[in-house]
Structure formats: structure tokens, C-alpha cells
UniProtKB/Swiss-Prot annotation:
UniProt organism field: Mycolicibacterium smegmatis (strain ATCC 700084 / mc(2)155) (Mycobacterium smegmatis)
Pathway where it operates: Glycan biosynthesis; glycogen biosynthesis
PANTHER family associated with the record: ALPHA-MALTOSE-1-PHOSPHATE SYNTHASE, GLYCOSYLTRANSFERASE
Domain of life the protein comes from: Bacteria
Keyword hit for Transferase: yes
Annotated function: Involved in the biosynthesis of the maltose-1-phosphate (M1P) building block required for alpha-glucan production by the key enzyme GlgE. Catalyzes the formation of an alpha-1,4 linkage between glucose from ADP-glucose and glucose 1-phosphate (G1P) to yield maltose-1-phosphate (M1P).
More details: Maltose-1-phosphate (M1P) is generated by two alternative routes: the TreS-Pep2 branch and the GlgC-GlgM branch, however it seems that the GlgC-GlgM branch provides most of M1P for the GlgE pathway in M.smegmatis.
Cited SUPFAM superfamilies: UDP-Glycosyltransferase/glycogen phosphorylase
Free-text disruption phenotype from the record: Cells lacking this gene do not show a discernible effect on alpha-glucan content and do not accumulate ADP-glucose. Combined inactivation of both glgM and glgB completely blocks alpha-glucan production. Combined inactivation of both glgM and ostA accumulates ADP-glucose. In the double mutant treS-glgE, inactivation of the glgM gene fully abolishes maltose 1-phosphate (M1P) production.
Pfam families from the UniProt entry: Glyco_transf_4, Glycos_transf_1
Enzyme Commission number(s): 2.4.1.342
Protein name: Alpha-maltose-1-phosphate synthase
Keyword Chloroplast: no
Signal peptide: none
Amino acid sequence: MRVAMMTREYPPEVYGGAGVHVTELVAQLRKLCDVDVHCMGAPRDGAYVAHPDPTLRGANAALTMLSADLNMVNNAEAATVVHSHTWYTGLAGHLASLLYGVPHVLTAHSLEPLRPWKAEQLGGGYQVSSWVERTAVEAADAVIAVSSGMRDDVLRTYPALDPDRVHVVRNGIDTTVWYPAEPGPDESVLAELGVDLNRPIVAFVGRITRQKGVAHLVAAAHRFAPDVQLVLCAGAPDTPQIAEEVSSAVQQLAQARTGVFWVREMLPTHKIREILSAATVFVCPSVYEPLGIVNLEAMACATAVVASDVGGIPEVVADGRTGLLVHYDANDTEAYEARLAEAVNSLVADPDRAREYGVAGRERCIEEFSWAHIAEQTLEIYRKVSA
């Protein structure tokens, strides 16, 4: 078996959960079968890199992406199975399946119709990305959803799909990379920021998008207990508009309270690990989240999690055992922000409970979310569609 793994992101250019998923999955699958990685971006060793057509420079981002997909198909002739991730490579997987007569497996890390704010980023290209996703999903031999909640969303959004073709394979976590870590003596990111380790720390790690709910967290932070510090590792804004909105909100928060730290660049793993490990609470305020690898990263670092109850998050964060779930209501976001603050303050006021949640979270990661198991599940789907 030879798998063509199609992805927009691959090391060293990984900025989201789908990229993390592909990176870890490939490492484990290569112990079980042959895998060729087909990705986008800068040239790199160990992968076929597909580039957009240079004559489309300046065109809508969705169109340039599709031209890269065509180049990706051209390099996948040797595959016996193609496996695409997200709409960015869905068309490549679909066309490779048609052109070479091989099965197409598609992992749905999110669904375009459930992310209408993407129209801010893509303009009319949002209609293109939605069409690509529908075409690829409905034609795929198998669709992998990263949570049971995501599987329900897939079947609701694309009712033409045969439910037997939709499988659940959750995201995982490498607990040898994500673990409780003390600040380094010489290169402590917390020391560089000026964070007081003797005061409670609330942390957020993620991109600045509507989906991730950063603005809701910043609004909630006005209600945090006075001694709480907020460390925001938030960058890569989707649009100038949301970048300005979040920047203005953080500035207002910093004027209203002390201990607000904003890291705008994407930090390396060891620095994120340090921040997560030092945090009293990690907050995931997402308004849409098929699973949320970042919650697993925080839990693996033995940190209690406060998260919204959307999508697949309840399949990761065990409410009252590894953290607290907060109900999200799109029609009453002010109440949601108040509930976020209440949950955070309850754990800050009870550090023993926060520590217990953290320990239980790491145990849950080790027992239930190994990448080796995820690779075995994925390989079984390859075998099924190839039979």
C-alpha cells in the first residue's frame, strides 16, 4: 500500500490543528505502510511540494489554492490510496481518485458551511471552498471525522452521504512532547514577558479567528479576579478586521487591569509547553471546534481546562474531571463571557481542584489519545476502501 497524504501544512510550516494531525499521523503510519507527503509552501525534504500557478498571482486565494491542487494531483500517480485533509486539498484527492482509479479518504477537520465568517477572509472564494468541500466529501470513498460531534455535523451538512462511509478517528497527542515542564533557567519565556509565577495565570494559545473566540475571552477577562494574569499567545489573524478588533480589545483590557501579556508571534513548542505548564487554567473559548488539539496539549501539560461546550470539545475535556465546560450561546454571548469568567475564577479560587483536574487530564491523554492507535484506525479504513 502506498498512501498519498495531501495537506496544506507540513513541517516546518504548521500553524493549526490539521497540520499537527497530519504531522503526527504520517510519523506513525510510516511504521505501517509507505506514505508520500504532498503539501504546499516552501520546498522541503521528504515531501512533494505543490505550488500555485504563478500566473494567478493576485487572484482570489481560493483560485490559487485550486491551482496548487492540480499540481499536487500530478505527483500522486504512484499512490494506491489518496488521503486529503481539509478543503484545501479535497479537490486534489478527488481528482487523483478519478484520474488514477484509486480510493479517496478525506479527513474533515472542519466544515465550510459551519464557518460563515470565512467569507471575511475569502470573499467570493468562500463559495468556491464550499463547493470544493461538498464535491470532495460527497464523492469520497470514506470520510473521517475527528470527533463524534463532527460526524454528526458531516451527516447533517451533507445528507446525501451514506452514514457507513463516515468514520470517527479522533485527534491525538504526543505526551513525550507535551508534558509538565518547569521554566528554563536561561530562556524562560515567562520571565521574558514579566509574568509573576506567584500569581494565578490564565493562558490561551491559538490563531486570531472568529472560530477561536479570542474576543470572548478578552471580554470575559474584565471579570477575572484581580490577581489573575492573562497570557495570550494569539497570532496569525485571518483578516485585518479581526486583527484590529482583537488589538483594540486587548489594549482596553490592559488599561483596565494589570497582568495582561500578548505574544503575537507563533512560539516554538518548548515555549508553549512552558506557558501551558505554568498556567493555573487554560481557556479554550472557541465558538466552533470539531475537536481542539490545543486542549489535549494543555491537558498533557497537566493543566486544568475551561472550554466552551461546542463541537467535539466535550469528547476531550471531561467536565468536572479534567476541567469545566461552559455553554456557548451564539444569541447571548455576553452571558457566555460571564460564564467563562465564573468558571475561571472558581478554579483560581481552588488551586487544589485545578491541580487535580490537571493530573486527571494528563492521565486521560496517555490512556485515550495516542497517535499510534490513531494510525492503526486510519490504516484499517485504508484497507476497507481498498478491498
